[in-house]
């Protein structure tokens, strides 16, 4: 049998870059803040609606008038953008996706209302015309 030689590593590894909190923060690769977040908002037709989505407990689908109340929370949390997910009636969906170019569709009305009240927030959206 041959003797296996162990490497010449020190018994103590001096991790000088991890010793102090300030240096750990300076060299960390990833930092997550509210600036990195996008708040999802589910939108539906109607007035004064806040219906819980059964498959996502604690998550609600809001009518346009109630979106503004939700956006106040988003602004207070300093989240820079929202993503809108509309609930489009199946009768409005067609093979050409004509709802996508209708300036009075649910998503366009939602964006107009949001931008009139919160012009600085970013809005990401989906016309939700999938079958």
Language-model features: where?
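N-terminal amphipathic/basic leader segments beginning at the initiator methionine
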Residues: 1-28
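Non-catalytic positions within long, well-ordered alpha-helices that form the structural scaffold/packing
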Residues: 72-75
């Amino acid at each position: 049998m041959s003797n296996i030689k162990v490497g010449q590593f020190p018994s103590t590894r001096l991790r000088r870059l991890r010793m102090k909190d300030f240096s750990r923060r300076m060299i960390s690769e990833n930092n997550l803040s509210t600036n990195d977040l996008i708040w999802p908002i589910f939108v539906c037709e109607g007035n004064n609606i806040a219906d819980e989505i059964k498959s996502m407990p604690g998550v609600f689908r809001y009518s346009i008038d109630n979106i503004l109340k939700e956006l106040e929370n988003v602004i207070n949390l300093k989240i820079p953008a929202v993503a809108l997910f509309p609930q489009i009636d199946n009768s409005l969906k067609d093979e050409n996706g004509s709802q996508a170019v209708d300036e009075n569709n649910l998503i366009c009305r939602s964006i107009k209302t949001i931008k009139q009240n919160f012009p600085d927030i970013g809005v990401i959206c989906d016309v939700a015309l999938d079958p």
